Curated annotation (Swiss-Prot):
It is found in: Magnetosome membrane. Residues 1-427 are annotated as: Major facilitator domain. GO terms for cellular component: magnetosome membrane; plasma membrane. This is Magnetosome protein MamZ. The gene is mamZ. NCBIfam families: MamH, MamZ.
Amino acid sequence: MPRNAEAPAKGTTADDFAPTQWNIIYLLMTVGALMAALSISIQPLLLDKIFGIAFEKEGAVNADIQVVAEIVSIVCVGWFGLLSDRIGRVRIIALGFLIAVVGAAVSLLSLQVGLAFGAAGLVLFYLTRVLLTVGADTVQLQLSTLVGDVSSRANRPRLMGNLVFMMVFGGTMLAAIVMQMADYPGGVFLIMCLPLLAGIAGFQLTRRNLRDVAPPQPASEDDEHPLRQVWTVITSDPRMQLAFAAAFYTRADVIILSLFFSLWCISVSDLVGVTRTFATAHAAVMIGLLGLAVLAAVPLWRSFIERHSRISAIGASLSLAALGYIWLGMFANPFNWLVALPLLMVGIGHAGCFVTLQVLTVDASPKPILGAMVGAGYLVGGLGTVMLVQSGGYYFDALGPRAPFILMGTGKMLVTLYAAWLLANGIDETCDHHLKSARTVDWKPLVFLTAALPFVWLVGRSVIEGYISNGSLGEAPVGFVNRYLGDWAFTFLIISLAMRPVQEITGIKTLAKYRRMIGLFAFFYAVMHVLAYVALEWALNLGDMMGDIYKRPFILLGLVAFALLIPLAFTSANSQIKRIGGKRWKKLHSATYVINALVALHFILAANHENGEPYVYAAAVIVLLWYRFHQWRGGNVLRALRIG
């Protein structure tokens, strides 16, 4: 079992840090947040003016780039979190700055290729966004962990609040000021140069000024795997379950607003008679106002969480942000300065939730696995970002530019209801921030609600917008709805396929009871995907469908995969396992490997040349299938990777 979360490590008090080192930490956090914010804020303008992406594809392509960057970042940054417990935080921070420097250098190359060849430079831009996201997120995560190492329960809200303050200052206020250069000749080039210079400066400052304070935790064969320890902490503490559910929606706040508010301004710029560079600068100003709200609210929330329950703080901050998002979704014109009011609400809510999550995670984490716990929180937030940005991109193109904000608002309301349910059932903190009872909570309701949310939101939004009022979704939205449902089916297939390797790597056997639930959601979204194609796209016209399949043979691959998935779904119950027999059931369900391969090929052939997302999904399938094949041949992947 993990050691006590507050076991003191010698020489790790806040007083052991000189004021100069604290200033360096805050400065580096500002630099890391600035690099991340600039790469996101400039993206819509580059895709529109440099790479020539068509207006009707802007939402999906912007979302795809962010999704690819987040998927790669989840893997890399999560691994760095585990590694930092063994080799220290400072080395990983320096590595993060180096990765960002490489990404910034590639971005300048992609700019020149884009100017010369248009969309041909998009591949390099994908690489740029991946490297900058991995580098900047690594820096911010490890700096938070370093402050967690040196803080105590008494001063943690203040220190974490200061860190969040500087991160928001760099990611919103400072980024908003820098983005004003976009409206001037040569301004875009200067903006793209700044992450390169900032990364080099951050690397030098890290090497010369930072030092680790927590002793490295060398790996031992007798120790429980860190991920298993993380799971133990989360499952034994309902506050952490709430915190991770909130992180799913909170980390995406700035990304969603920076990306889709900028896209919204650009998409209507011609209608209101302004240039697209001016629209980008205007969006940056509004995001800067959001950042100002966060900065002003951090001290207030810091005081609140010192005196009140963290569960109450999460619920209150999430509900405020949710109302702000829903209000923002009701505006028709992003250039109406009244949109600042809901943005201020989102900013205040984001500040409370983010600070509370940081403090609660460090409070509940045993010191030896603090890096792994913070990394797990990043993993959940990254998965949320992937799912929300992916959905937001489709909604932006199919249902309008305000749709992503409604998505965020409804998701936050869902977690708010979960917080209210905990409080209503007597799960709360004492005055010194310890749980009043040792009651544990099953994850199944939360997993079910989260997995069902994309479909519920799609149906609800379609009804609100009137797409179903006349019995038809209309020609334009059908393609997006069909693709959206197919993406979710494939996403849940991959998650289901990945759960057994994760279970074997971590030793967390309880994951098995969620695997079939995830698999059934994959089948559900696959059914919706097929129905959308058959009923909405072709209105049950078999002749036209056959002609379409002849022209686009990849559809046949999808239908074969769906046919193979049907018996797996109908034999998933425990009663069917007993009826069929365990060995025959396992042999039948090994068809999931073929299904994933077929769907990956179907996805690649269906995608356009501007979309790199299918290749990332396919790479994930290849890695997982390689793992299963190696295990089937008698190899020990875990021992080969030195993680089992």
